[in-house]
Amino acid sequence: MADSRDPASDQMKQWKEQRAPQKPDVLTTGGGNPIGDKLNIMTAGPRGPLLVQDVVFTDEMAHFDRERIPERVVHAKGAGAFGYFEVTHDITRYSKAKVFEHIGKRTPIAVRFSTVAGESGSADTVRDPRGFAVKFYTEDGNWDLVGNNTPIFFIRDAMLFPSFIHSQKRNPQTHLKDPDMVWDFWSLCPESLHQVTFLFSDRGIPDGHRHMNGYGSHTFKLVNANGEAVYCKFHYKTDQGIKNLPVEEAGRLAQEDPDYGLRDLFNAIASGNYPSWTFYIQVMTFKEAETFPFNPFDLTKVWPHKDYPLIPVGKLVLNRNPANYFAEVEQMAFDPSNMPPGIEPSPDKMLQGRLFAYPDTHRHRLGPNYLQIPVNCPYRARVANYQRDGPMCMHDNQGGAPNYYPNSFSAPEQQGSALEHHSQCSADVKRFNSANEDNVTQVRTFYTKVLNEEERKRLCENIANHLKDAQLFIQRKAVKNFTDVHPDYGARVQALLDQYNSQKPKNAIHTYVQAGSHIAAKGKANL
């Protein structure tokens, strides 16, 4: 019944009711000129041609032609919300960041949840990691914690990131999702085993956005007021409890309600059922990092909680839906290099790569002045620098202040207290190969100790159901990697693949050639 619809379905009705006492606004052009007729174009006679002087039409159509901005190359499908972060435990011994200044302090936040590989209109219930990015609007500028719903990732070296994403996207010729591409990359990069195993476990399809954890994933550095530093990892655990979707239910929702996660989040907040997450850190001293049994900056591994327990810090609460999706979610831009004093990057190779990649793609997608867009603006800090001009400069461009540094005219000065913590690095400069670092020990622990028997069974079924569509030689490479983790892991997946492979094969298209250039060259030669 229409009377029992959810808040998302009734958005238009509620908007009208909120404006009930007001008269409708006067319809205008983009330039603010009142419009007398919005239904009929201006023509020379009832059957004549359109007149170029019909600026009502040209203003509308020209803007419509430019409505779309470039889609995010990853994390294109997403949902956003706003709220606050509240400190519940003192960690000033670790960090001088103002966001952690005292117990009870609240900092405004913006959060975006997303899938990774799908396009903007893709389903929310696919098996894919979820982005879980948090923007803290602090007095020292924005802090963007650009995380996922998994504590690990597929790769540990940023050089592989473009190829990894290409393998998860569409085939360059068929424009279809291609299991050959997906599993060829994963099987050739065994460092992906930890994340692949997590992805095909029950947690690979969260029940919406409210029932999953978030992780900063990378290793970061915290610096206190005395200049003392430690390494840390960030965790945010859902207070709603972990809930995942069975494969069949996820498939049904993908067809019947592909925006399931977006709808669930909007309706929960609109109904006053504000989702929250408890925020924790793990801490490791520099001395501990030197003797750690593996690289503490390796994004494919976790820090054991028994050795580095979770330290409670605060709570994330989401209590406001976006007023306009495009303005506040599609234009939202997260940048891992946005770190206020007290929070710094570690040598994590993936984090180091993201420090460049994220602001670079935002400048492409939103323009060089994307930080002036209201949702991205560090509105609780006063931005004062020597950056000027550029497309879509929306403020006063810092008026008549000098645009060079140093200068003698009382323009912005550097602040010594904001200097980064000193770091020590190896003097050896080369491309260090990390591909053969231990890729199986933590995966074995996850498989044998974290998952129970039923969960292991579903894991192997999920993998085989996806891997079966790849070519046999790729299947064999993948199974070898699973066997390296644990013989039972590989044997179960292989047994299921044998069942699939014994059935009549489906028609498959495998087109990995560079024929186009050869054909073109041959054609030119025959001219």
UniProtKB/Swiss-Prot annotation:
Positions with a binding annotation for NADP(+): 194, 201, 203, 213, 237, 303, 305-306
Q: What reaction(s) does this enzyme catalyze?
A: 2 H2O2 = O2 + 2 H2O
Q: Which residues carry this modification: Phosphoserine?
A: 9, 417, 434, 517
Documented EC number(s): 1.11.1.6
UniProt-annotated stretches for the region Disordered: 1-34
Question: Where in the sequence is N6-succinyllysine found?
Answer: 13, 221, 306, 449, 480, 522
Give the Phosphothreonine positions (modified residues).
Answer: 511
Q: In which tissues is it expressed?
A: Expressed in renal proximal tubules (at protein level).
Q: Which residues of this UniProt protein bind heme?
A: 358
Cofactors demanded by this protein: heme; NADP(+)
Read off the CDD domains from this record.
catalase_clade_3
> Which Pfam families did the record assign?
Catalase, Catalase-rel
Iron listed as a keyword:
yes
- Name one molecular function that GO assigns to this entry: protein homodimerization activity
What is the top EC class of this enzyme, as a single word? Answer: oxidoreductase
What does UniProt list as catalytic? Answer: 75, 148
- As stated in the Swiss-Prot or TrEMBL entry, residues carrying the post-translational modification N-acetylalanine are 2
Q: Which InterPro entries does the UniProt record give?
A: Catalase, Catalase_3, Catalase_AS, Catalase_clade1/3, Catalase_core, Catalase_haem_BS, Catalase_immune_responsive, Catalase_sf
Subunit structure, briefly? Homotetramer. Interacts (via microbody targeting signal) with PEX5, monomeric form interacts with PEX5, leading to its translocation into peroxisomes.
What is known about what this protein does? Catalyzes the degradation of hydrogen peroxide (H(2)O(2)) generated by peroxisomal oxidases to water and oxygen, thereby protecting cells from the toxic effects of hydrogen peroxide. Promotes growth of cells including T-cells, B-cells, myeloid leukemia cells, melanoma cells, mastocytoma cells and normal and transformed fibroblast cells.
Q: Which family does it belong to?
A: Belongs to the catalase family.
What protein name is recorded for this chain?
Catalase
Q: Which organism is it from?
A: Rattus norvegicus
Q: Please name the gene that encodes this protein.
A: Cat
